[in-house]
A protein has these predicted regions:
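Eukaryotic scaffold repeat domains enriched in small/polar residues
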Residues: 29-390
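Residue-level signature for tetratricopeptide repeat
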Residues: 362, 396, 429-430
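TPR alpha-solenoid repeat register
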Residues: 389, 422-423
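TPR/TPR-like (Sel1-like) alpha-helical repeat modules
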Residues: 398-420
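Selective detector of the "anchor" transmembrane alpha-helix that sits immediately C-terminal
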Residues: 431-455
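N-terminal juxtamembrane cytosolic/stromal segments of multi-pass membrane proteins
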Residues: 456-510
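Hydrophobic alpha-helical transmembrane segments of multi-pass membrane transport/permease proteins
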Residues: 504-524
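Alpha-helical transmembrane segments with an aromatic anchor "belt"
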Residues: 531-579
């Protein structure tokens, strides 16, 4: 009984601790039915703390129910214009989600895209009507733009507008279905002047395709699939008039930020496969939503900050989507994601961690490095391994001249460029303070060596060490090891010596193999940060040794078989020693 009581006394607290631990783990994901990921310094996806939490779901505008909504616009004053495509109308709500008005009934035929200016002028891309409709703030139709008549547009091309944005000058940029020339640029002057195409995607062709097409006949080439640029899937415009596009299948060019010449100014290493919508944030950041509900957030340089969200599995969990059509960012940094299948708008709220990161991101992008350090410090207090925060902190310290601190954070974030620059500056500072001493030491060493050489010449002070070294060098194993240098200088004579003069043995060859393995492992795992190719703290020495041995056996075996076929005189051990 005493033993049973002791066991119970020990087991009960342990079980309670396990229950508390499991409960805390469940609570972590109770508010978000998805995980949040970021990219570490090695370019691998790693889980991080939740960046955005589901806040609410908008299923109705006032008492109006949406049917297959395909786009929406959120203004700074809180007004939201939803393109209720199933009902062929636009539904407008205020900041409290109260219905303001509806318009477009009887005019819209197959609306796909909407853009609303700060003055509440509404532009609608209507695919079925083959037109762009413009409505004033009261919902009255004021203008209609149809297919441009300019020959440069293309006589055989149809005008099937899908998405639209408008800059501050009133120039419209329209994505049209099956138009691979780029976005259609239309000025409102003279009732709609076609200005040309903007932001055309490049064609993609690998070396094999180019070579294959070169040897085919004209008839065979005609049967091949045409190599034409992809049409953008969606776009957004920021307050400066810079246009962002997304195009599936473009890999590093999936997300583009286009300058005035239509050239991409951003490149991302992590990109979604099926992008559906893009939005510009309030802190020089960009959001891309996939059709399946995943949301990617990038900073101003194209570095991936977060991936979160996901596809609903039918359980109707808040925060998960079925088919995303559009994404918008509110002035309070909340994210609004339109789901056409569910006919609702999911709203996500940034966590405290994300708010600090956004503040730091904005200050850093504006060159206010000293101010950015405080929010960056808050971020690192919550997650000291967050790559972007360490990278930004390192760059901020570098700008201030704190190169030691910059070196530390650059190493944590695996920022090779900043690490190299910081190391260079530290070396320069060291040389400025120690160059004279280094020169004097080198002169002193040179003088000592000269003096020792003179003494040895007159007194023979190094005769005893020379005799000892000569005696050591005359030993068989040492001679065999030294033969390596002869072999490198004269490989043909070296092979002859191995085959007919037994200049080396299996023992000396094995010693050289072990030395080579040791140097390989040291070079791989214990080299400098800038040249290291493996994760710090990650060791797989047995696999490395096995790989070397397997490669050696294969090479020796292949050479032996070739020698045998060609009636060579070398034996297996000779080939092993020569390699």
């Amino acid at each position: 009984k005493k033993y049973i009581k002791k066991i119970i006394a020990f087991a009960v607290p342990l079980l309670l601790a396990c229950v508390i631990l499991v409960s805390s783990t469940l609570e972590t994901y109770a508010d978000a039915p998805y995980r949040t990921y970021t990219v570490d310094g090695y370019g691998s996806m790693t889980e991080t703390q939740t960046a955005y939490l589901p806040f609410k779901t908008i299923t109705k505008i006032g008492e109006e129910t949406l049917v297959n909504p395909t786009d929406f616009t959120l203004l700074e004053d809180g007004y939201m214009y939803v393109l209720d495509s199933g009902n062929k109308r636009v539904v407008v709500s205020d900041a409290d989600n109260e219905l303001v008005m509806t318009f477009g009934e009887g005019i819209l035929q197959g609306p796909r895209g909407i853009y609303v200016t700060p003055e509440h002028i509404t532009y609608i891309a209507d695919r079925d009507a083959k037109s762009v409709f413009v409505f004033d703030g009261d919902g009255e139709l004021v203008n209609t733009y149809t297919k441009p008549t300019a020959a440069m547009y293309g006589e055989t091309l149809d005008f099937l507008p899908l998405k639209i944005v408008v800059n501050s000058s009133g120039v419209m940029y329209v994505i049209c279905e099956s138009n691979t020339n780029g976005m259609v640029e239309i000025s409102p002057v003279d009732g709609g002047t076609f200005l040309g195409y903007f932001g055309t995607n490049a064609t993609k062709a690998n070396l094999w395709t180019i070579l294959w097409r070169a040897v085919l006949t004209d008839a065979q080439r005609a049967k091949m699939q045409s190599n034409i640029p992809a049409t953008p899937d969606n776009m957004a415009i920021d307050e400066k008039g810079v246009i962002y596009t997304i195009t599936r299948g473009e890999h590093n060019d999936t997300l583009k930020r286009l300058n005035i010449a239509g050239v991409n100014m951003i490149e991302t290493s992590e990109y979604p496969d099926v992008p559906a919508a893009v939005a510009v944030g309030n802190h020089d950041n960009t959001f891309v939503a996939t059709q399946t509900g995943f949301i990617y957030e990038y900073n101003n340089e194209g570095n991936l900050l977060f991936i979160f969200g996901g596809s609903d599995d039918g359980k109707q969990r808040i925060g998960l989507s079925t088919k995303v059509e559009a994404i918008q960012v509110g002035t309070d940094d909340k994210l609004y994601v339109l789901d056409s299948d569910k006919a609702q708008i999911q709203v996500y709220e940034p966590t405290e961690f994300t708010r600090y990161l956004h503040e730091a991101l904005y200050l850093f992008s504006k060159g206010r490095y000293e101010e950015s350090k405080e929010p960056l410090g808050k971020v690192l207090e919550m997650n000291n391994l967050f790559t972007y925060a360490n990278m930004a902190m390192g760059k901020a310290l570098y700008k201030e001249g704190d190169y030691e601190g910059a070196l530390k954070y650059a190493r944590l974030s695996k920022d090779m460029e900043n690490y190299s620059d910081s190391f260079w500056e530290i070396r320069n500072v060291w040389l400025k303070h120690n160059l004279t001493a280094v020169v004097l030491i080198l002169i002193g060493i040179f003088a000592v060596l000269k003096a020792l050489k003179l003494l040895d010449k007159k007194k023979g002070i190094f005769n005893a060490p020379r005799k000892a070294l000569k005696k050591l060098g005359d030993k068989k194993l040492i001679r065999e090891l030294k033969y390596m240098f002869t072999f490198m200088r004269h490989p043909i004579d070296g092979c002859y010596g191995i085959r007919f003069e037994n200049k080396v043995s299996i023992a000396s060859t094995n010693i050289l193999l072990v030395i080579m393995m040791v140097f390989y492992i040291i070079n791989k795992y214990f080299c400098g940060f800038l040249t290291k190719t493996v994760r710090e703290g990650s060791y797989d020495i047995l696999s490395d040794i096995g790989m070397i041995l397997v490669a050696l056996v294969l090479v020796v075996s292949c050479n032996y078989l070739m020698c045998t076929i060609n009636e060579g005189e070398g034996k297996f051990r000779h080939i092993y020693s020569s390699l």
